[in-house]
Design a protein with these regions (language model features):
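Hydrophobic alpha-helix immediately C-terminal to the catalytic Tyr-X-X-X-Lys motif of short-chain
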Residues: 147, 151, 155, 185, ...
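Conserved catalytic core of Hanks-type protein kinase domains
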Residues: 73, 192-193, 224, 251
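A short C-terminal helix-loop "cap" of Rossmann-like NAD(P)-dependent dehydrogenase/epimerase domains
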Residues: 159-160, 187-201, 254-261
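C-terminal "lid/loop" region of Rossmann-like NAD(P)-dependent oxidoreductases
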Residues: 204-206, 234-235, 243-249, 254-275
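Amphipathic terminal alpha-helices
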Residues: 289-297
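N-terminal Rossmann-like NAD(P)+-binding domain of SDR-like oxidoreductases, especially those catalyzing
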Residues: 1-169, 215, 284
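Residue-level signal for the nucleotide or nucleotide-sugar donor/cofactor binding architecture
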Residues: 55, 84, 92-95, 132, ...
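Glycine/proline-rich active-site loop of Rossmann-fold NAD(P)-dependent oxidoreductases
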Residues: 146, 171-187, 195-197, 202, ...
């Protein structure tokens, strides 16, 4: 099989690429190394690598010829940078996604798996969060990513392109970003401890997140290439377990001092995924426990 991975040099994308290469597949990677979060990039030299921008349709379109499956992860993928530069967020996450879908349609790609976000649920929905709940977008990031969701559904309904959308819940694991003020909290805490600094906790630290290991996310993406139903639909990819930030800090560095910093606008208070739909239709479920992973580091 031949796969194309947008954002394939980033955190989640590079883990998917490595899995595909290990399984002997042909892989095309598109990534322009765009990041407002000091992210590192990982290019697998066994893939066909292109430092292209998904906003440039004429540049990326020829690469879709002969591709069977597309994993679309290229994005402005952080809340705070999207708030600071909403135009870029819309250009990348909406126009870029439309370009990927149109190129996939033109070249008769079998399936597009789109990576979206649990930020779509906002503040108003009670936990556990279900795919059927209304969107409550609080920032340009969630608005632009959910616009991508609607594009995927439209391309399925109108053009017959098979798409599957994932709403990820706080992905962590190998290659997670650890640098910059917007680094995800697990990587940030680990970096702060390794540097001998206190862990910085936003607000009171009682806000919760559903932390999902990147290996489980990779498995979900692979499962989406094999399912027979669920096209044009959304699936939560999480664990169904919520952990607050103070609990997380204690897991990473028991007894260590934390430094509370002001809350940031546009962020959810509590997240916890209902993953029953993914279990039923994708035959997927998470395997990696957060505390086990931390203790095994």
């Amino acid at each position: 099989m031949r796969y194309l991975v947008t954002g394939g040099a980033g955190f989640i994308g590079s883990n998917i690429v490595d899995r595909l290469i290990d399984e002997g597949h042909s892989v095309v990677v598109i990534d322009n190394e765009y990041s407002d979060a000091h992210e590192s990039f990982y290019w697998n030299n066994k893939a066909e690598n292109y430092k292209f921008d998904i906003r440039n349709y004429s540049e990326i379109e020829p690469l879709f010829k002969g591709v069977d499956y597309v994993f679309h992860l290229a994005a402005e993928a952080r809340i705070q940078p999207a708030i600071e530069n909403p135009i870029a967020a819309v250009e990348i996450n909406v126009v870029g996604t439309c370009n990927v879908l149109q190129a996939s349609r033109k070249h008769n790609v079998k399936r597009v798996i789109y990576s979206s976000t649990s930020s779509a649920y906002g503040l108003k929905n009670p936990i556990p969060l279900k795919e059927s709940m209304p969107k409550d977008c609080l920032n340009p990031y969630s608005v632009s990513k959910t616009a991508g969701e609607e594009l995927c559904k439209m391309y399925t309904d109108l053009f017959g392109l098979k798409t599957i959308t994932f709403r990820y819940f706080n992905v962590y694991g190998d290659r997670q970003c650890t640098k910059g003020q917007y680094a995800p909290v697990i990587g940030l805490f680990m970096k702060q401890i390794s540097n001998g600094n206190p862990m910085t906790v936003v607000g009171d630290g009682l806000q919760t997140r559903d932390y999902t290991n990147v290996k489980d996310v990779v498995n979900a993406n692979m499962a989406a290439t094999e399912c027979e139903t669920g096209f044009g639909e959304i699936f939560n990819i999480g664990t169904g377990v919520q952990t607050n930030i103070l609990e997380l800090a204690e897991m990473i560095a028991p007894g260590k001092k934390v430094l509370h910093i002001p809350e940031r606008p546009g962020e959810c208070r509590f997240t916890q995924a209902d993953i029953s739909k993914a279990k039923e239709i994708l035959k997927w479920e998470p395997k990696i426990n957060l505390s086990d992973w931390i203790n095994g580091r």
